């Protein structure tokens, strides 16, 4: 399956318990053969503390603003099987 995640951050676990949960879940989905794209808004407090800037188990799309990424999101949603929107997603 193709699964899109919209979440707070997967690239930085700094002050962010969401990242550890996302990492475990998405790693397990990847190991089962699913294709994952994670959309994360670029936030300075996470950008300066990224401990996983290129996750090996998903495609990470860091974006500056919703307007800058919404055309890409619409395109990816067309053939996605699942879209997951996490809490605190801007």
Regions found by a protein language model. Give the residues of each.
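Structural motif
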Residues: 8, 40-42, 64, 85-89
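Glycine-rich loops and low-complexity Gly/Arg-rich segments
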Residues: 27-31, 61-64, 88
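Conserved nucleotide-sugar phosphate-binding/catalytic loop shared by glycosyltransferases and other
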Residues: 49-71
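Amphipathic coiled-coil/heptad-repeat helices and related helical stalk/stem segments
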Residues: 21-22, 69, 89-90
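N-terminal subdomain of nucleotide-sugar transferases
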Residues: 1-46, 50-51
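Short catalytic-loop micro-motif centered on adjacent basic/acidic residues
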Residues: 38, 60, 81-85
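Short, well-ordered alpha-helix to beta-strand connector turns
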Residues: 33, 57-58, 79-80
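Short N-terminal targeting/anchoring amphipathic segment
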Residues: 73-90
């Amino acid at each position: 399956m193709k699964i899109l995640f919209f979440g707070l951050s997967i690239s930085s676990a700094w002050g962010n318990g969401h990242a550890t949960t996302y990492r475990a879940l998405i790693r397990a989905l990847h190991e089962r053969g699913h294709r994952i794209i994670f959309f994360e808004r670029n936030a300075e407090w996470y950008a300066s503390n990224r401990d996983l800037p290129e996750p090996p188990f998903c495609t990470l799309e860091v974006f500056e603003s919703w307007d800058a990424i919404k055309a890409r999101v619409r395109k990816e949603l067309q053939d996605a099987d699942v879209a997951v929107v996490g809490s605190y997603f801007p």
